[in-house]
Structures are given as structure tokens and as C-alpha cells.
């Protein structure tokens, strides 16, 4: 069972989850552990889960550019700004903070090996603007042989 399955089982029974072009990334290409998971969890827990009405959507699309594999994680949730207001008094999560700390270490060894960007207001909807996370991974980095 994975992160999406658990969220569907507990909170988002009607979630529509789509993965596109997974075969673009070679099966022997190893990603840093948890990299995609943190972005997917944030999309579900802080975005999509706060929708009052469906549809509840999560899309992961894989692309191949010149030097990078691209992973786009798009949700139609409430967006990061509204989510931060809802979670204002709750404890601060460490998922993205830890991920960016890891990226800082990796990128200090290999220039621009991994980049993560977030884009808001993906959809033209006043209440459910959505968020897109874009992860860029250099083709040439072997993360398995990487020593911290």
C-alpha cells in the first residue's frame, strides 16, 4: 500500500489519481528516497483533502527534457496560500524542509542535480486554485552511488 492508497482509504475515497508516462524514466534510474512522496503527501493532505465538493484530483506526469527528467504533480485542492491560513496554528511539518535540506547537500556535490518548484493558481476557480510541484532530475546523476 502506498501514500495515495492510504489517503484514499482514510480521507479521499473518491480521489481520481492518474499517472502519465511513467515509462519515460528508465527502471534502473534511482531517485532519492521520499522525493516524490513528500510532494504527493502535501498535495493530498494540505490541498485536495480540504475540498468540500468533488472532483478530487491528483495527477503525476513524467516528462523527458534535454538534460532532465521532469515529474509534475498537480492537484485541484485549495492551494498553498489558503492551506497555510488553515494550518496557521498547527505544528509546522518537516517533510519539505527535510527534502530541501537533502537537495542542498546533493546540489552541493552535483550542480543543479535536483530542482523543485511550486506553482499556484493552476485552475481558474476562486475556491480551489490547485498547486503544481515540478521536480527536475538530471539524467546523468546516479543517486545510488552518491555519498553524503
Q: Where in the sequence are the language-model features?
A:
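Two-component histidine phosphotransfer core
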Residues: 1-119, 125-127, 136
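C-terminal end segment of the histidine kinase catalytic
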Residues: 124-148
Amino acid at each position: 500500500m502506498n501514500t495515495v492508497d492510504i489517503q484514499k482509504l482514510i480521507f479521499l475515497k473518491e480521489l481520481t489519481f492518474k499517472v502519465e508516462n511513467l515509462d519515460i524514466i528508465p527502471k534502473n534510474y534511482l531517485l532519492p528516497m521520499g522525493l516524490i512522496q513528500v510532494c504527493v503527501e502535501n498535495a493530498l493532505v494540505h490541498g485536495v483533502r480540504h475540498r468540500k465538493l468533488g472532483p478530487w484530483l491528483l495527477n503525476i506526469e513524467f516528462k523527458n527534457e534535454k538534460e532532465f527528467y521532469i515529474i509534475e504533480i498537480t492537484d485541484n485542492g485549495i492551494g498553498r496560500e489558503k492551506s497555510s491560513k488553515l494550518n496557521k496554528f498547527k505544528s509546522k511539518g518537516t517533510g519539505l524542509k527535510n527534502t530541501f535540506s537533502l537537495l542542498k547537500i546533493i546540489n552541493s556535490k552535483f550542480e543543479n542535480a535536483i530542482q523543485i518548484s511550486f506553482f499556484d493558481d493552476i485552475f481558474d476557480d476562486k475556491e480551489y486554485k490547485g498547486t503544481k510541484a515540478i521536480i527536475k532530475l538530471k539524467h546523468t546523476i546516479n543517486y545510488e552511488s552518491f555519498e553524503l
